[in-house]
A protein has these predicted regions:
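Substrate-binding pocket helix/loop in short-chain dehydrogenase/reductase
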Residues: 87-88, 95-97
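C-terminal beta-strand-loop-alpha-helix "lid" module of Rossmann-like NAD(P)-dependent dehydrogenases
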Residues: 164-215
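The beta1-alpha1 cofactor-binding region of Rossmann-like NAD(H)/NADP(H)-dependent oxidoreductases
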Residues: 54-64, 93
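A short, exposed helix-loop element centered on a Lys and neighboring polar residues
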Residues: 111-112, 156
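Active-site helix of classical SDR
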Residues: 111, 147-150
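Conserved glycine-rich cofactor-binding loop
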Residues: 13-14
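Residue(s) in the substrate-gating loop at a strand-loop-helix junction
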Residues: 131
Length: 273
């Protein structure tokens, strides 16, 4: 009887992480699903996944979990994160720090925790979930872009460093994904203070985002990303990074064709008219 390979998935209680955990389990992996929502974790357990309540920013807890996984981690998928939309002048630094700790520092620490075992075995895959928001920047979500640009650098640097040990690091950059968190943000009807200097901009940004998301083909489902994760995990020689979603590919391609000044005008025309 063959031993199932181990996969560790963060942010597994919803969205991309949950879909990825399910896909990997169906593909024959023993999946350790990490999250913080008790009800969602219980549901994962009922589906046969090994669910753990864990804050990825808790370094001691992360190291303890990795040490307890019999046979080591063969596949690590870093999915934990959350959106952050706010003009940069008004963004709460505590929110930005938390996003950076959750998305970048935790991803690096988890990689550090699993790499010794991967190096010893001479194999392993680390998949980082980035965003097309790491390929270009736009107003209204500057803090999110800052962190996603960081994920690009983390993944590409780490990939080159660990490749000689037989470890593959791959970055997936999805376009907008229809997750419960994103949907709730789009459906919200916030009220802005009359003296908010960014009030008009925020209303335009929210309206623009809703209209764009309603267009066919703009947003993708979490399972689309999960299927991409499974493909790169199975690939013998995956590329350093992939864009997931046609709309994301089109936007990144268009950005590459125009100058910085032209891109600047496009963004301001879309959100300030």
């Amino acid at each position: 009887m063959s031993v199932k390979p181990n996969a560790l998935v963060t942010g597994a209680t919803s969205g991309i992480g949950e879909a990825t955990a399910d896909r990997l389990q169906a593909a024959g992996y023993r999946v350790f699903a990490i999250g913080r929502n008790p009800e969602a974790l219980q549901a994962l357990s009922l589906r046969g996944l090994t669910a753990h309540a864990l804050d990825v920013t808790d370094e001691a807890a992360v190291e303890q979990l990795v040490d307890e996984i019999d046979g080591g981690v063969d596949v690590l998928v870093n999915c934990a994160g959350f959106p952050l939309t706010c003009p940069l002048e008004q963004v709460a630094l505590s929110d930005l720090r938390l996003l950076f700790e959750t998305n970048i520092v935790a991803a690096l620490h988890l990689s550090q925790a699993v790499l010794p075992g991967m190096r010893e075995r001479g194999s392993g895959v680390i998949v980082n979930i980035g965003s097309t928001g790491g390929r270009f920047a736009s107003p209204g979500a500057g803090g999110y872009h800052v962190v996603k640009y960081g994920m690009e650098a983390l993944s590409l640097s780490l990939r080159a460093e660990v490749a000689p040990f037989g470890v593959r690091v791959v970055l997936l950059d999805p376009t907008a994904v229809r997750t419960p968190f994103v949907t709730s943000q789009q459906e919200a009807q916030p009220v802005y203070a009359p003296d908010d200097p960014y009030g008009d901009f925020k209303r335009r940004y929210a309206d623009y985002t809703r209209r764009l998301s309603a267009k066919r083909g703009v947003m993708i489902e979490p399972d689309t990303v999960a299927r991409a994760v499974l493909r790169v995990v199975r690939a013998k020689n995956p590329r350093p990074r992939y864009i997931v979603g046609r709309s994301g590919k089109a936007t990144v391609f268009a950005r590459a064709l125009v100058t910085d000044r032209m891109w600047d005008r496009i963004l301001m025309r879309g959100l300030h008219d």
